[in-house]
Amino acid sequence: NTDKQWHDRYYHGYDFIDKTHDFGATVVNIHHATGINPFINYPFLRTKEMNAYIDGAHALDMKVKIYNTVRELTNSCVEIFALRSLNGEIFSKGKGRGYSWLQEHYDQDYIAAWFAYTVKDAAIVNTGVSRWHNYYMEGLDWLVKNVGIDGLYIDDLAFDRMSMKRVRKILNRTNPGAMIDLHSANQFNEKDGFANSANLYLEHFPYLDRLWFGEYFDYDMPPEFWIVEVSGIPYGLMGEMLWEGGNKWRGMI
């Protein structure tokens, strides 16, 4: 992990691959709501474009990871109404609302999630472990083999340790150099039950390559805060700062 820390240079965003290379990046994280990954947690509708982008990156000895998890699911998912018909197995029940398309096409028994206005992408919240996880695993296997992705950028984990082990095995089987990065906002607040992000995801750390503990973390806090709340170093994990520019002096340490 230490060797990777000195070698890997991240570009966190979708841009021309030559530009990211000139910037000095060796790894690109492709978020959702971008040209080649427009729909959250459903990266199957722009696969030709994604493959071409990744081929260009590989030609420059760069890696490309994509945003893809199971926390919520886009309304652009081809199977969305079949999944909705499973009576709450895949999607959590709630008060509905959210983007107008959701209200017009779904019964009002869902929980509205992320909405990306640039691509009119509206998502609803998934339940815990379900058969959708098997779809996710098979889809990940297909993406590694046919699109050439080099790993995942996971925005908060919505599956268990066993699922993470499956993800790691799928990636390693076809692409031994593939990476898994975990991003989390600071969950020490009333809405999230005053949780510690590191403690919340600790069981997954052996399978990760890097932590991105971002929004609402105060990188200017004392060392004790860093060790307990921010740093993965006690567990052998390096990390990045993803909030208001971070603290570059502490980041160098």
What kind of region is each of these model predictions?
Residues 62-77, 153-160, 164, 168-205, ...:
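Aromatic-lined carbohydrate-recognition surfaces of secreted/lumenal glycan-active proteins
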Residues 2-141, 145-149, 161, 169:
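Aromatic-lined carbohydrate-binding/catalytic grooves of carbohydrate-active enzymes
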Residues 81, 86-118, 175-253:
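Glycan-recognition surfaces
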Residues 25-28, 62-64, 150-152, 178-180, ...:
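Hydrophobic beta-strand segments of well-ordered beta-sheets in folded domains
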